[in-house]
């Protein structure tokens, strides 16, 4: 067994020597290739390791570059937006400037007054002193054009726009409307008469002779009726808000004027049945400050309420034309008479509508004096006849009554006072003690702040406190005591009479006394913090009021002053004041040496 094994072994090693070399060469070659590959791979690995170590730094560089590029992009975007906005603004400015240039380059537009239109679309207009027939722009509806309306004309004198009616011009007086209805005869400021066309607003509304019209003299159109302030100011469109309950101490006078004014209007059938004519006028006379004007206003208020209750309408109305005497006087001859005519013309117009109208003349003696009694002029010679004719004209009207007020009825022309004109004469006298209490009660009210001490005296009853205050202050005012002596008058026959403050009291004086007392209460509250009106305030106010009226009008005719103040009878030739000072040491004085004027006397 060992023989063949060694034989085969030696035979094999000696039999193939070339194969071993080739194998070795192949092996070495393979080793060399592998070594080369390993070396390449090692270099590749080294290079990869080197690249791997360098990658984070490159990433950071790239990120920084990217951030820088983004910032530059944002900056460029903002600059681009600004540039776009600038370009747009420049374009808008260019467009605006172009429009402005085009607007300024347009030819001027003229104005004209529309006269009439035609079926073919043309119209007549008056412009620049010429009457032209022109066409109307398609943008303008020719049907809406009204006579007298202002229109705008382009360069070719075509109507391109409709405007409102003219609002400025001259004021003329309407004399009459002509038969055609669209023309009127007017009187200018120089008494020049001319015929004008009536614009559409005047064609739609009623106009009367005597109205003031606004005209444009070049076109000859009247556009608007202008209210006449001289008459409109005298008309109180709203009913006066004064009622009979607000007037104190004049119950008898109120009843008399209600019988004269309200009964004929509210019970017309009964008056007709008894063939009784209603009075045309009422004269309220008496001293100043006693309520004559208040009564006249209360009549209008009461009459309006009675009309509302009788007719069932929602809002009763009574027109109250309040004419103060001196307002009518004018330096031009005939102006006063004209204004009187206008006042009664307005009264007739309102009365024709079924509304009661009261024409109230305050201070009637200032213009309707006895004819022939003027010193520097005799204007009353024409004013009085004008009023007489107007009052007689009221005879045919059912709803107009004249009320006059005066504190010198003896100076009014007797023709005005006779029956058939101012039929009813009501004397508004100075208040006596009972009337004074009634007047005080209108102003000293329980809801006023009253002093705690005064309330305590009357058990906290506010009504009783007010009554107690009124009772004491009236007793103080009407006491015929030494401190209340006011005047000593000497009559023509030599008799003398002492007059007290109560003889010159009035409703206005009582109102002023209460106002003084309230002001004292306010000052006490401000200075000392004590709230409430008290008795002492009223008594002090009464003394202050008496003291103020110490000075009388400086007149050389005491009898005239006595008539104004309400003391009438035998002629007075001398008046001496008896008012003493606070200490009772001041002597009486003659009025002839006194220059100041009292408040109510």
Curated annotation (Swiss-Prot):
SMART domains: AAA. GO terms for molecular function: ATP binding; ATP hydrolysis activity. Residues 1-29 are annotated as: Disordered. Residues 600-601 are annotated as: Docks into pockets in the proteasome alpha-ring. InterPro entries: AAA+_ATPase, AAA_ATPase_domain, ATPase_AAA_core, ATPase_AAA_CS, NA-bd_OB-fold, P-loop_NTPase, Prot_ATP_ID_OB_2nd, Prot_ATP_ID_OB_N. Pathway: Protein degradation; proteasomal Pup-dependent pathway. Residues 19-106 form a coiled coil. Keywords: ATP-binding, Chaperone, Coiled coil, Nucleotide-binding, Proteasome. The keyword ATP-binding applies. Consists of three main regions, an N-terminal coiled-coil domain that binds to protein Pup and functions as a docking station, an interdomain involved in ARC hexamerization, and a C-terminal ATPase domain of the AAA type. ATPase which is responsible for recognizing, binding, unfolding and translocation of pupylated proteins into the bacterial 20S proteasome core particle. May be essential for opening the gate of the 20S proteasome via an interaction with its C-terminus, thereby allowing substrate entry and access to the site of proteolysis. Thus, the C-termini of the proteasomal ATPase may function like a 'key in a lock' to induce gate opening and therefore regulate proteolysis. This is Proteasome-associated ATPase.
